[in-house]
């Protein structure tokens, strides 16, 4: 491998924001945040879903905030989202 052209492959902590679960793995992800875990400082990558919170792995169904998404869409696009296609 050529020196200086590859990203830094290092240990990183990934934190599931839905339940706080943290795990250490190796990654090339770039992040500014750090966290101290097990007496050592690691870069921190925040993720929305992991195997600890995804319904496929947990077997539990979670209700997502789809109503908030619909309202946000309606506020953003208003009458343009009437369903009619302009020709």
Curated annotation (Swiss-Prot):
One of its GO terms (biological process) is translation. GO terms for cellular component: ribonucleoprotein complex; ribosome. Keywords: Ribonucleoprotein, Ribosomal protein. GO terms for molecular function: structural constituent of ribosome. The keyword Mitochondrion does not apply. SUPFAM superfamilies: L28p-like (SSF143800). InterPro entries: Ribosomal_bL28/bL31-like_sf (IPR034704), Ribosomal_bL31 (IPR002150), Ribosomal_bL31_B (IPR027493), Ribosomal_bL31_sf (IPR042105). NCBIfam families: L31 (TIGR00105), PRK01678.1 (NF002462). Part of the 50S ribosomal subunit. Belongs to the bacterial ribosomal protein bL31 family. Type B subfamily. HAMAP family: Ribosomal_bL31_2. This is Large ribosomal subunit protein bL31B.
């Amino acid at each position: 491998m050529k020196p200086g052209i590859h990203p830094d492959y290092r240990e990183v902590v990934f934190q599931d924001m839905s339940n706080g679960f943290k795990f250490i793995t190796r990654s090339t992800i770039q992040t500014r945040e750090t966290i101290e875990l097990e007496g050592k400082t690691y870069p921190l990558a925040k993720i929305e879903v992991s195997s600890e919170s995804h319904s496929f792995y947990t077997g539990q169904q979670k209700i997502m905030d789809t109503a908030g998404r619909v309202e946000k869409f309606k506020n953003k696009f208003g009458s343009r989202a009437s369903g009619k296609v302009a020709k």
